[in-house]
Amino acid sequence: MNTILITGCSSGFGLETARLFLDRGWRVVATMRTPRATLLPESDHLAVLPLDVTDAGSIARTVAEAGPLDVLVNNAGVGLLNALEGLSMGSAREVFETNTLGTIAMTQAVLPQFRERGAGVIVNVTSSVTLRPLPLLAVYTASKAAVNAFTESLAHELVPFGVRAHLVIPGRSPETAFGTNARTRMGMDVPEAYGELAGQVFANFQQATEELTRASDVAEAVWRAATDPACPMRLPAGADAVAWAAA
C-alpha cells in the first residue's frame, strides 16, 4: 500500500487531499499543528500526527513516526495581506518560515529515503498569485514564488535518483482559511495612504464573478502529480488558475 504524508490538513486543500487519497486506498499521514482526528473518517489507513514545519524537532519526530513514504505533499502555509509599509519584519519572516523554509525543511527530511529507494514524489502546493500578481500580497507572493523556483530546480536535481518534484498551483478558493489567517496577521491595520487601494482589493475579492478553485480541484491535481509520471512539472489547479497559466 502506498503512503502519502500531507502537511496542513486542518482545513481546505490539505484536508480534501487527505480525504481523496484515503478514498482511493492509500495510507494517509495527515499532519497539522494541533491534531483533530475527527476531521477525517476513522480508518486503519489513517494516521493524524502533530507537525510544526518551522520546528526541526517536530519534523524529525513526525517523519520518523510516519515510516516509509511514497509521496510528500507540502501544503502547510500561512497568508499575509497588507501593504508592505504596514508589515513588521517579524510577520514577513513568519510567512517565509512556514511557506518557504518549512517546505524546504520537510523536503530535506524525506529525501534520503526517496533517494535510497530510487523512487518518490514531492508535491509542493503554492498559489496562482505567482501567475497573476495582486496588490497587498507582495510578501506572501514572494514566499510562494520562492517555492516555485525551488521546486523547478529540485526537479532537475532529483532526476538521477528516480525522484519526481511537482508544483500544484491553485487559484483563489473560498474553501481555504487564507482570508482568515491573512487578516489576523495583517491586524486590519492597513496604512492610511493605502486605504483606498485596500478597499478596492477587498471589494474585488467579494465581488469576483470568475469561476474559482474548489478544494477538490487541488486534490485531483495532487493525485495526478503523485500517480502519473508523465504529468507536467507544473499543474495549475482550478478554472481560474488554468486560465491564468494559459494567458
What spans do the regions from the language model cover?
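SDR active-site lid
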Residues: 160-231
